[in-house]
Amino acid sequence: MLIYGRNPVLEALRDNQVTRLFVADGIDSKFTKELEAAAFESGVELEWYARIELDRAVKTTNHQGVIAEIPETDFAEIDDALELAAARGEELFLVLLDGITDPHNFGAIIRSAEVLGAHGVVIEERRSAPLSPVVVKTAAGATAHLPVVQVKNLPRLIDELKEDGVWVYGAAGEATAKLEQLDYNRPLALVIGSEGDGLRRLVREKCDELVSIPTKGKVQSLNASVAAAILIHTVISSRERKKK
């Protein structure tokens, strides 16, 4: 698979995932030095091409002058998220995506989840954008550090999580429960629905609680990735306060 963009490529190099590295002639020297250092550590040589050749390879000009070839991305397992939570000594926190089909939203949610401290992002096989180069670029390297899990049946996973003591909160604009009213200091899965349709009825019914983000403006709703970032930050902030 080809990935592109400076942050995703650097993270892939640092994670020893890159098999070939394609660089555009004339990119700035500061980034070239950083790229050369990371490539040297990873044992990969830089291959120089005219920028138009890179444009053709990924069918976009938005590659920032660097493309990397990596093995096809394998999805993680739920156990990988459990292990990450255990390694940090934290209660499990998963972000479940129900129908996020826009790759930019998907990538942005992965990025927010990794940066803010969630332990994994879970998607359903037939109701999600694929883990594509656009997603990887938008995630800005976060896919190298955060388990991204794909399941066949999200409602079934929710049942299994609940059986294991995980609480499931769903984001819903019409929910009466507000952010500050819920307990986040427990094993938790947060479900984010699509911008157009929200959560499916079956997913909604399986949630222990539905939560909304208070708004004051005239626009009805937030972008899915923005809403996810706010909710993820709320969970992590609540847990940090609990530690003090």
Sequence positions of predicted segments:
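N-terminal positively charged helical leader segments and presequences
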Residues: 1-84
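Structured adenosyl-cofactor binding patch, chiefly the S-adenosyl-L-methionine
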Residues: 10, 137-142, 201-244
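Short beta->alpha connector loops at strand-helix junctions that form conserved
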Residues: 24, 50, 71, 98, ...
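Short, glycine/polar-rich helix-capping loops at beta-to-alpha or helix-loop-helix junctions
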Residues: 31, 128-134, 197-206
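Surface-exposed amphipathic alpha-helices with a cationic face
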Residues: 40, 158-162, 236
